[in-house]
Amino acid sequence: MTLESIMACCLSEEAKEARRINDEIERQLRRDKRDARRELKLLLLGTGESGKSTFIKQMRIIHGSGYSDEDKRGFTKLVYQNIFTAMQAMVRAMDTLKIPYKYEHNKAHAQLVREVDVEKVSAFENPYVDAIKSLWNDPGIQECYDRRREYQLSDSTKYYLNDLDRVADPSYLPTQQDVLRVRVPTTGIIEYPFDLQSVIFRMVDVGGQRSERRKWIHCFENVTSIMFLVALSEYDQVLVESDNENRMEESKALFRTIITYPWFQNSSVILFLNKKDLLEEKIMYSHLVDYFPEYDGPQRDAQAAREFILKMFVDLNPDSDKIIYSHFTCATDTENIRFVFAAVKDTILQLNLKEYNLV
């Protein structure tokens, strides 16, 4: 055997080994890609109180195990605390807005409620139940409630205060709707994974308040879809953190930032224009043109208002090739979210298959 033939033989052995290693690497990459395809990361973004946490609760109801009686019982204290927080906010606003109580005895009731340390509330009993009922029935407090855009008040206030007898019952167990309406500011990051058609959807909810946003940064890797929530009803409200800044302007600024982040170049963007039910109520007495002078549509027209708001957000997209998928939602309405998320899921799966060249 000549030296050349021995070398050729060795080379072919080396080449074979190199090819084998290369094939193994290719196979592993394909496996990794396939496994990554099985888990889709959905990042829920939006300013504070846009409805992100409610959306996650709906995923648990629609695609998870829901809320057992034991789970619901865990929300009882939070419902009580929400009621006290709301009434305290209105009592304080009565002073700020200089609205008098119609009934003299409600001044004492207001003082009683004002002195409660909400963090320590774990029951809902008299004299507090009667005090809060009496206050809620006072025309002064009702006027204060009607002027709620001038201070910070939870969207669920009316829902709970109109149902005090049920909540004050000693055998009270929160309903699914009570659970959906409870307001607890999200601090930190909440993940909710659920399985659909053998794909894991990992939904990530990050705090919306400004102080929470700096914690988002490490969530940004491998995001399949950005789901951005906007509260339609916030067009006439100011921020919790800054009372001279319009909430919708803040939401627009955040959306603009998010869609231009290089991290999200390959992520699909789904825009949820949420709280459509509250917009329908509010548009009857609070005119969009007073806050967005460029609006030239009809007054008291929820359809025209929401189309205008949608266009404001879509126009922030600088990339004409990037489609923004949009849906009008009411996050506290399970059937609405079931319907909307079915469409969103199909969109995400289709886009994901396209990315992996499977369609």
UniProtKB/Swiss-Prot annotation:
Residues 329-334 are annotated as: G5 motif. It is found in: Cell membrane; Golgi apparatus; Nucleus; Nucleus membrane. Residues 178-186 are annotated as: G2 motif. Keywords: Cell membrane, Golgi apparatus, GTP-binding, Hydrolase, Lipoprotein, Magnesium, Membrane, Metal-binding, Nucleotide-binding, Nucleus, Palmitate, Transducer. Mg(2+) binds at S53, T186. Residues 270-277 are annotated as: G4 motif. PANTHER family: GTP-BINDING PROTEIN ALPHA SUBUNIT (PTHR10218), GUANINE NUCLEOTIDE-BINDING PROTEIN G(Q) SUBUNIT ALPHA (PTHR10218:SF329). It comes from the Eukaryota. Residues 38-359 form the G-alpha domain. A lipid is attached at C9, C10 (S-palmitoyl cysteine). GTP binds at S50, G51, K52, S53, T54, S156, L180, R181, R183, N274, K275, D277, A331. GO terms for molecular function: alkylglycerophosphoethanolamine phosphodiesterase activity; enzyme regulator activity; G protein activity; G protein-coupled receptor binding; G-protein beta/gamma-subunit complex binding; GTP binding; GTPase activator activity; GTPase activity. The keyword Nuclease does not apply. InterPro entries: Gprotein_alpha_Q, Gprotein_alpha_su, GproteinA_insert, P-loop_NTPase. It is a lipid-anchor. Residues 201-210 are annotated as: G3 motif. It catalyses: GTP + H2O = GDP + phosphate + H(+). This is Guanine nucleotide-binding protein G(q) subunit alpha. GO terms for cellular component: caveola; cell body; cytoplasm; dendrite; Golgi apparatus; heterotrimeric G-protein complex; membrane; nuclear membrane. Residues 41-54 are annotated as: G1 motif. G proteins are composed of 3 units; alpha, beta and gamma. The alpha chain contains the guanine nucleotide binding site. Interacts (GDP-bound form) with RIC8A (via C-terminus); promoting GNAQ folding and association with the plasma membrane. Binds NHERF1. Forms a complex with PECAM1 and BDKRB2. Interacts with GAS2L2. Guanine nucleotide-binding proteins (G proteins) function as transducers downstream of G protein-coupled receptors (GPCRs) in numerous signaling cascades. The alpha chain contains the guanine nucleotide binding site and alternates between an active, GTP-bound state and an inactive, GDP-bound state. Signaling by an activated GPCR promotes GDP release and GTP binding. The alpha subunit has a low GTPase activity that converts bound GTP to GDP, thereby terminating the signal. Both GDP release and GTP hydrolysis are modulated by numerous regulatory proteins. It is an enzyme of class 3 (hydrolase). One of its GO terms (biological process) is adenylate cyclase-activating G protein-coupled receptor signaling pathway. The modification 5-glutamyl histamine is found at Q209. Pfam families: G-alpha.
